[in-house]
Amino acid sequence: MKRILVAAACLLPFALAAEASINRHSPAAVVEAAYAADQTAIQAGGDGIMGDNVLRARVFSRSLLRSIAANELIPTASPAIIRDPLSDQAPHMAAIDVALVSESRDEAKVLAEFARGDGARERLTYDMVFERGEWRIDDIVYATLDGRSHTLRGVLAAN
């Protein structure tokens, strides 16, 4: 029994590395992984991706990271969307659907749609760039079904 556990523990890093190498080639998989990581951290009482600089660097482009960092230096309180950009402050997320909209060599668009806890559905479009050998989120376009829309970069620039 002990040998089986040791063998499984030794093989786990290889299995995770194989999964990571598959996912890095799919922009939609990056968005799905970002939601999974964010929700896991939030359910455990953490701040999600925005509270972990390593996760931020794996998910966001360098340009977007610089904009977020510059915004965090401003002494006034950041808008709530910046603290939780993946859900646009949805009270609860359910039935998340992620689909690739378009993909070129170095840019892609991914659509994520989910049910909010308040009964509305929300659509987020992720502008992705291929950077440092992986797909990364470069901007997020938030559009609710009532017709309002805004972007993460727009919110950052407004502060």
Could you tell me what each predicted segment is?
Residues 4-14:
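Sec-dependent N-terminal signal peptides
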Residues 15-20:
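Sec/Tat signal peptide C-region and signal peptidase I cleavage site
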Residues 21-22, 59-120:
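Surface-exposed, charged secondary-structure patches
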Residues 21-76:
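Core segments of small alpha/beta cavity-forming domains
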Residues 28-35, 111, 125, 153:
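Extracytoplasmic/secreted envelope proteins and their assembly/folding machinery
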Residues 73-74, 103-107, 118-122, 131-132, ...:
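Low-complexity, intrinsically disordered terminal/linker segments enriched in charged
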Residues 98, 124-130:
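Hydrophobic/aromatic beta-strand elements that line small-molecule binding cavities or substrate pockets
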